[in-house]
Each structure stands twice: as C-alpha cells, then as structure tokens.
Amino acid sequence: MIDKRATNSTEKKQETAVLVAVSPQRQSPQQTKEYLDELAFLVTTLGVETRHMFTQNLEHPDSKTYVGSGKLQEIQTYVAAEPVDMVIFDDDLSPSQVRNLEAAFESEEIKVLDRSLLILDIFAMRAKTAQAKTQVELAQYQYMYPRLTRMWTHLTKQKGGVGMRGPGEKELETDRRIIKDRITFLKEKLDKIDRQSMTRRKERDRLVRVALVGYTNVGKSTLMRRLAKADVFAENKLFATVDSTVRKVSVGNIPYLLTDTVGFIRKLPTTLIESFKSTLDEVREADILLHVVDISHPSFEEHMDVVTSTLAEIGAGDKPTIIVFNKIDLYQSPVETEADEDWHEVTDDTATKPLSMEALIGQLRKSFHARKADHVVFISAEQNENMDELRQHLGALVRDKHFMIYPNWLDVGYYDEGDWQKEEE
C-alpha cells in the first residue's frame, strides 16, 4: 500500500508548516485556538514543526482560495521569507481550491495540504494489519481521485514526506483510469477481508461484546490495558490505535470480548468512515459501549458531541453505554466563585483548599448524573483511580446481557460480593 522508504540515503530534515483556519462569527476565539491546537497536534504527530498559525474571520471559507485575497497575500509574504515546506488548512479543500492555492505558492515549491490529507497520512503511518492498510489505501485513493493536481501528478519527482505517504512513492502513474481501477481492486479486496472478519465475529457471537469508543487520545488503550491486564499499545499521540484490538476478559466467571477501536475526531474524513466499515462494525455489533472521555480537556463536552454524532451516523447510537470520564487526576476544577464554592472544601478557618479526589468525584457525579441518562463513572486509568466502580457497572451490564443469551447458564446464587476482586496495584 504505502512505501515509506526515503528516496535517498541521507536523513531528511524536519519538515515545517504554517497552519490556516477560518473562524465564523459563532465560533469563539478560544474555540478557534483549540481547533488550531488540535491541527498542530496532528502535524506534530507526523513529525512536522509548526512555524506559524493564520486565522481569518469568515463565515465560510472563500470558494476560490479558502481565505480572502488580503490574508492569502499575508501568508505568501510569510512563506517567501521563512523556511516553510507546506501550508496546511483546517478544512477539506475542494479540487479547485487546491489548484488555485498551489498556483499561489508555486514559486516557493510549497505543498498545499488539508486536514483530511493529514489524518489519512497518520492512518497510513499507524496501520499495521492487512485490513487496516487496505482500508487506508482505499481512502487515500478516493481522496486523491478528484484532486489530480500538481501535488499528485508530479509525485515521482518529489522527495516524499508528509502528504506524500501514498501511492506516489511507488512511482505509480497518477492517472484517473489507473486510480479508478485501483479503487475497484481495493474495494474487492476489502470486501473479501470484510467477509472473513464477519465470519470471525459470528464465531465470537456466543460472547458478550464490549467496545471502547471515544475521541482520539482520550486514553482508551490505557483503559484497555487496565481492564484486560494485557499489553496494548498506548501513546500520547493522535490515532495511536488504528487497528482494532480484541481481548477476552472475564467478570466473575463470565467471559466477554473487549475491543479497542479507532478514535474519532472532529471533521473525520468521510472516505475513512466508508473505508473503515469493517472496523466500525466492531462498534455497530457491540452489545455495550464504553464511551471514554478525557475530562481534563477544556473541550471535552464538544468531543463527546462529536463521538455521539459519529456513533449515530454509523448506526450505533442507541446501545447501552457507560460514559467513562477518564484522566480525573489531570482535571482542573472550575475557578472558585461565590456561586462555585461547592468545588472546594471549607475548613475551620474559612479558608478553602482543592477538593480531595473522593470529594471531586462526588461533585462530578452529581453534576453529570443530572444531565446524562447513561451510567457515568469517573476514573483515571493511568493512576488506577476508581477502577473498581467501573468494573462493577460494566460487570452488571455484561451479566444482564449474558443472562439474556443464556438465562439458565448459572445458578442465581453464583454471584456474590466476593466475586468482585480489586485489581492488584
């Protein structure tokens, strides 16, 4: 699928980029900053250094050049004076926008990339299994097909790097007919893989299935390690997990399957959702969802909305769900105000101090139970905080689902409090 080898033996220098975003009136400056910070995190994940960020207040991106002529001139002036390899935009660019922007930066030989291409590049870098590699390659070609501009047609002359981690590095002729044939081939290959995956899932149908879902980089893989007590790759990078990981776990004597799935993100490319159908089937066909949320992130509620919307989009929005607020050890309680004194403990000398972990969990539970219909648990998977409460909630749901499948499998008296064992430190 992807040839990641450099075209020469010398070590390549770190690539540099400037980031560009538009900010509609409904979007606060803080939101704009957070969105650009997320884009910068994507860029960092690919080993690229962000040199500068440009924003423009526009209700909608300019149909020709994404930003207005004045802002475009400002960016051109900057990249002409600074060592910049690429200009990256925080939205999908249309084929005509790509052509116009490439023309605007042609004299500087600067690559023009958008958010979807960055995400596809990260997925290409992370994919390990044949299924994931095929899914990513299909998504890449589907993205490439309407965008056969200078970026793609001259790939054989490029040195590779971010945005070039695709078929061009194999010196394939980027011709519409060839790409269309390749898309057809990959779809057929993926259909075969999907049928094999479906057969494997049917063989596992006798077990309750639990899927970890959530925004990218919220700690799903760390939580998987805690629950499964197994080695699962976890890293503080976006999309550290692309391939689904399945582990057999037991609660009491009831086994269930726990799946760590790919994280969601704002503006997830449609081609990825389509290509990752089989991977997302692990979520669609799960009996129970663990929706993991990084409560320490300032935009965690927006991230929850992104995940909820994506789950609804793939047909998994109505499943029994436990909302797992993770990273409570990093959570910063609201700044104290007169109306906010519940967030602090009052001492005898009327001074205040930050809430203890137990008190903080109590306040958070009170707040979110009033707003969410699902089970809500507050944990730190990294620090092993409050994991027993999560196991109890999850165990109850697994038992209920299991007995729906096998109502006479165990005597009623099998379960008692002694079956709940705390994880050893």
Regions found by a protein language model. Name each.
Residues 25-26, 62, 92-95, 284-305, ...:
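Conserved Switch II/interswitch segment of TRAFAC-class P-loop GTPases
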Residues 116-136:
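Short alpha-helix plus adjacent loop in nuclease-associated cores
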Residues 2-7, 33-37, 60-77, 243-244, ...:
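Switch II of P-loop NTPase G domains
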Residues 1-20, 40, 146-218, 224-225, ...:
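C-terminal-of-GTPase-core extension/linker across diverse P-loop GTPases
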Residues 1-115, 119:
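N-terminal accessory targeting/assembly segments
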Residues 11-12, 79-81, 248-252, 257, ...:
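Conserved catalytic network of the ASCE P-loop NTPase/AAA+ motor domain
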Residues 2-4, 202-205, 227-256, 270-275, ...:
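Switch I (effector-binding) loop of TRAFAC-class P-loop GTPase G-domains
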Residues 27-30, 62-65, 95-100, 120-124, ...:
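Switch/connector loops and helix/strand junctions flanking conserved nucleotide-binding motifs
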